[in-house]
């Protein structure tokens, strides 16, 4: 889905009228029918219902995969996506009436899109993982999971796994291996957008940002750092 002003792209349930979701259908990669569209609307209706239960959510969405998607989105603060003010850069996949999300376009992660300060990126709240200006009611699809205690705990567990990956040295090993492989290519690239010195400074800054992000998420999971925008606005420490 695309477009910051189109409410159907944010995967909210609007009504039963298929035309209300025209932005989604217009972005279809494969040929789809009204029958296919009806399955999507029915799924959104059940997912976004105030009565949605653990079982009903699992019936209409690939809960485990979407929770993993949410954990990564939150960790890397990718706001050029469903979590930002412009709900786009994703693929919606339906199979057997179950919805799934395929991620796309992460080049503006870690605050590259619509983020304020470095502190905002590092401490981006895990339990309201959307741009600060977004009402939680405008992200019903994700809030259905975050409002469910079972799925919230599972989401937190996936975040914890990402934190562990950073803090146990595995990320450093991969990061250093990749940068060593491209260092000379960057240095000798005649079409480079940045100087080699700028690249060197940036790669160290990115590494530090990821480390600080992991530290903040651990604090939010432990309860020592507020995990919502509201909580953080009341606690400037």
Language model segments and positions:
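Active-site-proximal structural scaffolding
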Residues: 33-37, 59, 63-68, 83-86, ...
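Internal "kinase-insert"/substrate-recognition segments embedded within catalytic cores
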Residues: 1-76, 124, 128, 159, ...
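C-terminal catalytic region of ATP-dependent kinase domains
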Residues: 93-228
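Ser/Thr/Gly/Pro-rich low-complexity, disordered linker/stalk segments of secreted
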Residues: 230-237
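Active-site acidic catalytic loop and adjacent metal/ATP-binding pocket
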Residues: 60-112, 210
